[in-house]
């Protein structure tokens, strides 16, 4: 049985002011993008200043998550140490060994195809279990060619609902916005939700 109120991760934060607003609004995780060639990517020095400012404020701060995709492990671990990241979200094809060697708690993204077969759904459940058994939190996101996370597109929620109904805890991502997030939570029953492009105005 999933919790009534899912955890909320706000991703793609680029300024201290936005991070503070998200934290004050009750976000459980703050996400910063470090994936090359992504519109919301932050340089390490700016990210470090943002994290320092957020964590030095009154009342503490939610965990800060750095987003990466198929980048060298040394680069990821350097960013963790430089920016004082609490967690990382790995949006590519990173292996279990890669996750284990990361110097922070890991959120591992699994991309869901538009029309998976029953066999592939079974494989997804096995992969979720494998990553969770290794200490990772799992995120389910839509599969869009050429994009790794932050697609702005949803997938068939019945697939996620079926996985959740079988006891798989995960964060739901992909095209979530203020207009559809309540329906998504009611339909799927996820452990958490990840909103990014759906709450943006510009940039």
Q: Which residues fall in each region the model found?
A:
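A structural motif
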Residues: 26-27, 84-85, 135, 189-190
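A C-terminal functional module that forms or caps the active site or interfaces directly
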Residues: 164-189, 200
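Acidic, divalent-metal-coordinating active-site segment for phosphoryl/phosphodiester hydrolysis
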Residues: 16-18, 96, 177-181
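Conserved anion-binding
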Residues: 34-38, 46, 51-172
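Structured beta->alpha junctions
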Residues: 11-14, 39, 68, 91-94, ...
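N-terminal beta1-alpha1 ligand-phosphate binding loop
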Residues: 9-20, 25-26
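N-terminal amphipathic alpha-helix/helix-capping segment at the start of soluble metabolic enzymes
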Residues: 1-11
């Amino acid at each position: 049985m999933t919790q009534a109120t899912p955890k909320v991760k706000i991703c793609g934060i680029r300024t201290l002011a936005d991070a503070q607003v998200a934290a004050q609004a009750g976000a459980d995780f703050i996400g910063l993008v470090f994936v090359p060639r992504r519109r919301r990517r932050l340089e390490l020095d700016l990210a470090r200043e943002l994290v320092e400012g957020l964590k030095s404020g009154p009342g503490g701060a939610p965990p800060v998550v750095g987003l990466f995709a198929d980048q060298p492990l040394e680069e990821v671990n350097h960013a963790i140490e430089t920016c004082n990241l609490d967690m990382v979200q790995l949006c590519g094809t990173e292996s279990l060994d890669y996750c284990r060697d990361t110097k922070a708690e890991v959120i591992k993204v699994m991309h869901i195809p538009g029309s998976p077969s029953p066999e592939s759904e079974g494989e997804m459940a096995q992969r979720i279990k494998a990553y969770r058994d290794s200490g990772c939190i799992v995120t389910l996101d839509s599969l869009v060619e050429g994009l790794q996370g932050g697609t702005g597109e949803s997938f068939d929620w019945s697939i996620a609902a079926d996985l959740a109904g079988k006891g798989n805890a995960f964060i739901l991502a992909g095209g979530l916005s203020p207009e559809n997030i309540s329906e998504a939570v009611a339909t799927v029953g996820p452990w958490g939700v990840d909103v990014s492009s759906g709450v943006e105005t510009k940039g």
